[in-house]
């Protein structure tokens, strides 16, 4: 659907607030300019249609933009800067709040990090005794459908970070977040290894495309 001229996105934001803007209008503000014969709003709508959603646009790799008309290096860096600002906003929140009190925010943060990765990545959030995030680390990178995980290395990094608790996470590049039996088995091994040093594993989140599954919510931890 083509763009019809109306209230400009910047003017709409000032008058009605940022929450009143569509995804395309917000994106247009960051893109700033369109192409010869293509208004910036139309460019924003075209990009969202091509990638399928704002989330997929923001998390796409640079190679995915090669066939995106109107997205040179300047606009690509603008888009990735927005995505990185969003990631840092989520992290600043998790660093100040109990990560277990808002599992949805934790899941969204991990989706930003993992959901569009082409290989399985096993990541750990290291938490202090108030469940504030100290840092995160990608511990292991595997293939398109598996990743080899070593519990002792996770324990070693937890001790280095002086972590009192952990949240585990890994992605399924297939897009389906349903945990496998292997996922459950390795989680049990990590929980047992950590308990020996009184480090708690609070959750394990499996990240898909636009969805995630929490072991804690299912009562598996």
UniProtKB/Swiss-Prot annotation:
Please state which protein family the record places this protein in: Belongs to the UPF0758 family. YicR subfamily.
What residue range is the signal peptide?
none
Which is a GO BP term held by this UniProt record?
proteolysis
Q: Pinpoint the MPN domain residues.
A: 99-221
Q: Which GO terms describe its molecular function?
A: metal ion binding; metallopeptidase activity
Q: Where is this motif: JAMM motif?
A: 170-183
- The answer to whether the entry has keyword Protease is yes
Provide the binding site for Zn(2+). Answer: 170, 172, 183
**What's the protein name?**
UPF0758 protein ECA0145
- Keyword rRNA-binding listed: no
Q: Which Gene3D superfamilies match?
A: Cytidine Deaminase, domain 2
Q: Which keywords does this chain's UniProt record carry?
A: Hydrolase, Metal-binding, Metalloprotease, Protease, Zinc
User: What is the species listed in this Swiss-Prot or TrEMBL entry?
Assistant: Pectobacterium atrosepticum (strain SCRI 1043 / ATCC BAA-672) (Erwinia carotovora subsp. atroseptica)
């Amino acid at each position: 659907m083509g763009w019809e001229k109306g209230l400009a996105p910047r003017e709409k934001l000032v008058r009605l607030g940022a929450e009143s803007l569509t995804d395309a209008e917000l994106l247009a503000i960051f893109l700033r300019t369109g192409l010869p014969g293509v208004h910036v709003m139309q460019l924003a709508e075209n990009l969202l249609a091509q990638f399928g959603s704002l989330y997929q646009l923001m998390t796409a790799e640079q190679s995915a933009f090669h066939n995106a008309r109107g997205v040179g290096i300047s606009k690509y860096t603008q888009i990735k800067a927005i995505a990185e600002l969003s990631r840092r906003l989520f992290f600043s929140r998790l660093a100040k709040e109990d990560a277990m009190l808002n599992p949805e925010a934790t899941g969204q943060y991990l989706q930003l990090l993992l959901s569009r990765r082409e290989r399985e990545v096993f990541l750990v959030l290291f938490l202090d005794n108030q469940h504030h995030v100290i840092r995160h680390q990608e511990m292991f990178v595997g293939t398109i459908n598996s990743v080899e995980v070593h519990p002792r290395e996770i324990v070693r990094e937890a001790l280095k970070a002086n972590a009192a608790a952990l949240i585990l996470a890994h992605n399924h590049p297939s897009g389906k977040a349903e945990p496998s039996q292997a996922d459950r088995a390795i989680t049990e091994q990590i929980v047992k290894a950590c308990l020996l040093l009184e480090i708690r594993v609070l959750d394990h989140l499996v990240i898909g495309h636009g969805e995630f599954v929490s072991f804690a919510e299912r009562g598996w931890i």
